[in-house]
Amino acid sequence: EDVARLAEFITRIRPLADAVVAMYHRLPAGQGRKLLDQALEQGLHTLDDPPEELTALFHQVDHEPIWLDRAQLRLACEVSHRVGLAGELVLRNLSLMGGYLAAAAAKPLAFTGELDRMANRRLVETGKFWIDVTTPGGLERDRDGFKSAVRVRLMHAQVRAMLLKSDKWDPAWGHPLNQWDSMATILEFSVIFLSGLRSLGFLFSKREREAVVHLWRYVGYLMGVDERLLPACEADAMRALYQVIATIGESDEDSRRLGEALARASLQDSGDGWLAKRLGKVEYTLRAGYTRYVL
C-alpha cells in the first residue's frame, strides 16, 4: 500500500498552480503575474473578469480548511522564535542539508547551475520565507506569510514547467517538485526541525510539538500539497518521515555538489579581513560538525 502511495505521488504535481503558470504564457507578457499580485494583495474580488485559473487557485487558498486552529498557529510561532539562532543552525545544517540526500528531489536545484551563488540565494530566500510564515499572525490572509506561501507555490510551478520542457530531465526521477517531495519539505520544517533542536537540548511539550506540525500542515495546504499527504499530528508526521527515509534512494554527485556549496556559504560570507576569514573557518567547522552529528 505504501509503495503504491509513493508511486502515485511522485508523479503527481500541483495542478492549480500549474494552470496559473500556463495562463502566464497565454496572456501578454507580465499581465498574468500582475493579475496574480493584485488578487494576492487586494483580493480576487478586485479583478473585473479574473481568469478561471486564478479563480480556481484563490477559491482553494482563500478557503480555510475545517481543521485550521489559529490558536495552534500562534503557539507554533512562539515556539519557533524562542529557540533563537539555534533554529537557523538546524534549518540550514540539518533540514536543508538533509534534503540533498534525496538525489531525485535535489535535481531541480542542481539544474540551476552556479551552485555557490545559488546556495547563498537559497539561504536568503528560505530564511525570509520561514520568518514570514512563523511571524505571529503571518498566516492571516493579508499578511506576508500567507502571500509568501502562495508565491513559493507559483515559483515551484514555473520551475516545474521549465524542467519538464528540458530534454535533460529524466522521467525516472519522477515529476520535478512533485507532491511526495513537497510533503518531505514540509517535514523538514516541522518534525525534522524539532528533532534537530531536541538534539541540542531544547525541550518541547507535546502541545508545542503538535502546534508546530499544525502550522506546517497549513503552510503545506497553501502551497498546494495534497491534503492526504499532510500530517495531521506529530505521530502522522513521524510515520511520514519514516516512509520518506525508507524510499529516499541513494544520493549522487549532484547531492554532493549541492551539499558542498551549502557548506561553503559560511566561508563566502565571512569577509576579506584576516579575522573575518578565521571566524568564517570556525563557523564552517561548527556547522560541518553539527551536520555530521545529526546526519
Q: Model-flagged regions — what are they?
A:
Residues 1-186, 190-295:
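Mature, function-bearing regions of proteins
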